């Protein structure tokens, strides 16, 4: 296993237990499978992965592959999820006479990533306090009467690119101090990393890893890309990249 800084998203269906009791079992499974399939597509498109399902809730992670800007991509996925659920609300109300909605919580922090399980049945798992915090941020939506909240640690990563609808001060479960959580309504600009496979320019394929203006003249910065350490150098306004000390 290894320790990574991840953007973690916890998503839960509002009042699903009483909702599921209204419907035949095959309708419940159909709704859940359709919902999970569409959520997985949105998360994958933004560079994340659903890591675990807990009943009608799920945990998604961004940054396992060491791509940058994980909080922005995670928040973008959350906003797209809410938009998709708004469409599902009408469909499920018309076809099943149920009120369908979700709550989303996002946190950014360190977590342990590794294979867990018995022999022959191991899977990639994420454990640690950050997972618990993401879950508690999601739960705080109920008290705040919101749909999407992100922790202060997550907000710091995107504060100059996020539009805040409101913020709340709450005591998260297990904490004696109040935490500030932010309700995000919109993101500005776009992610610093492309979620497409590659960018084709000047006859070559390139990976977008950061904005060029963020690297000042004379600066150096190490980044991880596809499990390789890349050294970026800006000198006389010319950009160079070094991998294993070999410039390319």
What do the PLM-derived regions correspond to, one by one?
Residues 2-76, 124:
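Catalytic NTP-binding/metal-coordinating core of nucleotidyl cyclase/transferase enzymes
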Residues 32-48, 64-104, 108, 129-140:
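Alpha-helical scaffold within the catalytic cores of cyclic-nucleotide enzymes
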Residues 12, 106, 246-248:
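Conserved S/T- and glycine-rich ATP-binding loop of Class I adenylate-forming
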Residues 199-247:
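N-terminal pre-ligand scaffold of iron-sulfur
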Residues 111, 134, 142-199:
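Cytosolic regulatory/linker segments at or just downstream of nucleotide-handling modules
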Residues 8, 58, 102-108, 181:
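A structural signal for short, well-ordered beta-strand segments
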